[in-house]
């Protein structure tokens, strides 16, 4: 049976990366929340 998680760095960054977050208002809100919380890593990219 094929597993559901088939990792790909490109797809990961395109959907969850920094530039993807910055591309719309809600994504920027995500980054703002994570900055306020004090996360060392804001997104999966970097």
Swiss-Prot record:
<dbReference type="GO" id="GO:0003735">
    <property type="term" value="F:structural constituent of ribosome"/>
</dbReference>
<dbReference type="InterPro" id="IPR000271">
    <property type="entry name" value="Ribosomal_bL34"/>
</dbReference>
<feature type="region of interest" description="Disordered">
    <location>
        <begin position="1"/>
        <end position="46"/>
    </location>
</feature>
<dbReference type="GO" id="GO:0005840">
    <property type="term" value="C:ribosome"/>
</dbReference>
<keyword id="KW-0687">Ribonucleoprotein</keyword>
<dbReference type="InterPro" id="IPR020939">
    <property type="entry name" value="Ribosomal_bL34_CS"/>
</dbReference>
<dbReference type="GO" id="GO:1990904">
    <property type="term" value="C:ribonucleoprotein complex"/>
</dbReference>
<feature type="compositionally biased region" description="Basic residues">
    <location>
        <begin position="31"/>
        <end position="40"/>
    </location>
</feature>
<dbReference type="GO" id="GO:0006412">
    <property type="term" value="P:translation"/>
</dbReference>
<comment type="similarity">
    <text>Belongs to the bacterial ribosomal protein bL34 family.</text>
</comment>
<dbReference type="Pfam" id="PF00468">
    <property type="entry name" value="Ribosomal_L34"/>
</dbReference>
<keyword id="KW-0689">Ribosomal protein</keyword>
<protein>
    <recommendedName>
        <fullName>Large ribosomal subunit protein bL34</fullName>
    </recommendedName>
</protein>
